[in-house]
Amino acid sequence: MPKIIEAVYENGVFKPLQKVDLKEGERVKIKLELKVEPIDLGEPVSVEEIKKIRDGTWMSS
């Protein structure tokens, strides 16, 4: 059964932030999901503007 835990990546190693019930040497699959904070742009941004930024065409206007 999948279990979600938080971990920190330091010196090339994922370090769990809580106790993990695993045997030494046991293999697991890790799905990475970066924790990000929202950016306050100070004003509303349209979907079209977001698409331009995503597509890299925002500098051409």
From Swiss-Prot:
Disulfide bond entries: none
InterPro entries in UniProt: AF2212-like, AF2212-like_dom_sf
Keywords: Toxin-antitoxin system
UniProt key word Endoplasmic reticulum: no
The organism's place on the tree of life at top rank: Archaea
Function: Possibly the antitoxin component of a type II toxin-antitoxin (TA) system. Its cognate toxin is VapC21 (Potential).
Similarity comment text for this entry: Belongs to the UPF0165 family.
The protein's name in its UniProt record: Putative antitoxin VapB21
Organism lineage: Archaea, Methanobacteriati, Methanobacteriota, Archaeoglobi, Archaeoglobales
